[in-house]
Curated annotation (Swiss-Prot):
NCBIfam families recorded: biphenyl_bphD
Gene it is expressed from: bphD
Active-site residues annotated for this sequence: H265
Site (Transition state stabilizer): S112
Listed name of the protein: 2-hydroxy-6-oxo-6-phenylhexa-2,4-dienoate hydrolase
Catalyzed reactions: 2,6-dioxo-6-phenylhexa-3-enoate + H2O = 2-oxopent-4-enoate + benzoate + H(+)
Positions that bind substrate: G42, G43, N51, N111, S180, R190, W266
One example GO MF annotation: 2,6-dioxo-6-phenylhexa-3-enoate hydrolase activity
Residue spans crossing the bilayer: none
Pathway participation: Xenobiotic degradation; biphenyl degradation; 2-hydroxy-2,4-pentadienoate and benzoate from biphenyl: step 4/4
Keyword set, alphabetical order: Aromatic hydrocarbons catabolism, Hydrolase, Plasmid
Enzyme Commission no: 3.7.1.8
Length: 286
């Protein structure tokens, strides 16, 4: 088997969806079997490969086709200013990508912004949704216990507005529980992505000015999602509050919750081995 790397799995598709006309989506695509689409978060410099390179190998080895798209306006995908809430537009992008790749149905894995996209996809395209795995998803409105936005989201917007290596360090320090995991390689790679795509940063701010984060809230519709769902959370998440996990399992018909201790907002990276075991078991047996 060809070694999995960003370059060996990289490809582009062109989609045509509402708000995304003749739009190029970049993705990494590896393996054969049932499709698992992993949707990344919304921090500056984020992308499919950088969010999930600790997960793609075990999922491919377990017999899945793993697809890591760059969301519209991120990394190598085309630039865009959005006039609708981002979770919905990103869900349309996933649907368009599936059409282009000839995929009828897929399991969805979504972190933060990617979780919001997964929730919107499950609502808009239930017949094309397999199982759903969420990690600290956005798009769930107010918190019972925390003032919103939380500390991490404030730093995220600061980094979008005033990109600097120092602000990136500040955000990553809040991002993860164990700050020793913030290697120079991770820091420099993320910073390089930020510098490579200044248009993406400006467009994210413009989109947020047009459509505020409060518009992402799909809480009133959670009962419509019939897909089997595994909700995971970092106990120490400083971006999205843990009580949102309880909101999900209280309102979705078939959802369960797993909380990782000593874990921030990036469970699939901070606790990659445990996350891979848990989620692969859920896909096979959940």
């Amino acid at each position: 088997m060809t070694e999995l790397s960003e370059s060996t799995t990289s490809k582009f598709v062109t989609i045509n969806e509402k708000g995304l006309s003749n739009f190029r989506i970049h993705l990494n695509d590896a393996g054969q079997g049932e499709a698992v689409i992993m949707l990344h978060g919304g921090g500056p410099g984020a992308g499919g490969w950088s969010n999930y390179y600790r997960n793609i190998g075990p999922f491919v080895a377990a017999g899945y086709r793993v697809i890591l798209p760059d969301a519209p306006g991120f990394n190598k995908s085309d630039a865009v200013v959005m006039d609708e809430q981002r979770g919905l537009v990103n869900a349309r992008a996933v649907k368009g990508m599936m059409d282009a790749l000839g995929i009828d149905k897929a399991h969805l894995v979504g972190n933060s912004m990617g979780g919001a996209g997964a929730l919107n996809f499950a609502l808009e395209y239930p017949e094309r949704t397999g199982k759903v795995i969420l990690m600290g998803p956005g798009g769930l409105g107010a918190s019972l216990f925390n003032p919103m936005p939380m500390e991490g989201i404030k730093l995220l917007f600061k980094l979008y507005a005033e990109p600097s290596l120092e602000t990136l360090k500040q955000m990553l320090n809040v991002f993860m529980f164990d700050q020793s995991l913030i290697t120079d390689e991770l820091l420099q790679g993320r910073w390089a992505n930020i510098q490579r795509n200044p248009e993406h940063l400006k467009n994210f701010i413009l989109s947020a000015q047009k459509v505020p984060l409060s518009a992402w809230d799909v809480s009133p519709r959670l009962g419509e999602i019939k897909a089997k769902t595994l909700v995971t959370w970092g106990r120490d998440d400083r971006f999205v509050p843990l009580d949102h996990g309880l909101k999900l399992v209280a309102n979705m018909p078939d959802a369960q919750l797993h909380v990782f201790p000593r874990c921030g907002h990036w469970a699939q990276w901070e606790h990659a081995d445990a996350f891979n075991r848990l989620t692969l078991d859920f896909l096979a047996n959940g």
